[in-house]
């Protein structure tokens, strides 16, 4: 069986000097290898093909047959690595917390321990007749959330 660690090392070698980053590698018991990469400006098919060929050049099909799939992390998929938070700062995201809260807002900041989202809330201010829309920052640790993902908007 092909080891995940081996595939990760091959991918990291290809990534050197590039702005791409590794999101996830999975290797199933029947040697189906799935590699997900990402980039701040999106993933190009030509780069997926190049990475696929690079991996194939490092693995020996004669020794062990495998199926290989290389692609992007997916625009509507939950974030899996910290770099995905970094590249989406300033963009709208959806956050679902472990206690079931679901909110959408602008990703303002992220570091290794937490991230901050600016959320629009209706608040009735003293002396006003109608609630006003205000933005409030909410900060979460990664342990508090079920998932965060880029919110696709068709506005």
From Swiss-Prot:
Disulfide bonds: none
One GO process term, biological-process aspect: translation
Record-linked SUPFAM superfamilies: YhbC-like, N-terminal domain
Major location (coarse): cytoplasm
Annotated organism of origin: Bacteroides thetaiotaomicron (strain ATCC 29148 / DSM 2079 / JCM 5827 / CCUG 10774 / NCTC 10582 / VPI-5482 / E50)
Known role: Required for maturation of 30S ribosomal subunits.
Subcellular location: Cytoplasm
HAMAP family from the UniProt entry: RimP
Any one Pfam family match given in the protein's UniProt record, by short name: DUF150_C
GO cellular component, as recorded: cytosol
InterPro entries noted in UniProt: Ribosome_maturation_RimP, RimP_C, RimP_N, RimP_N_sf
Listed name of the protein: Ribosome maturation factor RimP
Keyword annotations: Cytoplasm, Ribosome biogenesis
Annotated family: Belongs to the RimP family.
